[in-house]
Amino acid sequence: LESRGLGDVYKRQILILMKFFLENFKWLLACSLMYFSSCFGQTFFISLYANEIRSFFQLSHGDWGSIYALGTLASAFMMLVLGGLVDKHEFKKLLILVFISLSILCFTMVLNSSLWILIGIIFGLRFFGQGMLFHLPSVAIGRWFGQNKGKATSISVLGFSLGEAIFPIIMTFIISFVGWKFSWSFGGVLLLLILPFIVTLLKVERTPKSSRNQVIEQTGLNDKHLSLIHI
């Protein structure tokens, strides 16, 4: 009896989750694609090129590690400084800026032969990819889903898990055909293809429905506040 009761609970939870997903498909898919696109600035993705970058720029393991650490620390500092922009500026405009910037960085990697520019590229990939493209959907979920943000996050973050699973295979295949430098153009093109799709999905931003007319104040980066309404 206990087993049957537990099974009924699981079924009910699955049905609730499916209903939630279908009702909020556009916004959940948009956030999932943002998490997916952040992969181009994540460590697991950039590390696919570690040996090729070290060989091309004649770097030791220590040199490359220092460059990567510097770019990561600098991007983390910039997130503290600029992370609050999402609270002050229109979400879609900021999203477009981040996507285009990350795409340009991917194309720049194709053409680059300067060590100094490489340092800037690594910083940019970490800031716009690992930083902003993970920050934006996280803030959006808090703004759009209120008390259901945990449920929304658990669904949307699957986009990142998908990228983490497929990109190593896809990029290894592409690198074997076109070389490591030109393979970065795949990222630049893919980002430009995903962007208009997300913008279309977010043509109308989700407005949480208030059942109690209560407002929660959520503090984000830079001590900015987001008004979140109970659903």
Which residue ranges define each predicted feature?
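Single conserved hydrophobic/aromatic residue that forms the stacking wall/gate
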Residues: 1-13, 229-230
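Hydrophobic core of transmembrane alpha-helices in multi-pass small-molecule transporters
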Residues: 116-132
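Extracytoplasmic
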Residues: 27-52, 57-61
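Symmetry-related core transmembrane helices of the 12-TM Major Facilitator Superfamily/SLC fold
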Residues: 184-200
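Residue-level signature of mid-helix packing/kink "hotspots" within the transmembrane helices
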Residues: 72-80, 165
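Intracellular juxtamembrane helix-capping segments at the cytosolic ends
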Residues: 132-145
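Conserved MFS/SLC helix-loop-helix module at the cytosolic interface between two early adjacent transmembrane helices
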Residues: 77-110
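Glycine-rich segments within core transmembrane alpha-helices of 12-TM secondary carriers
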Residues: 149-168
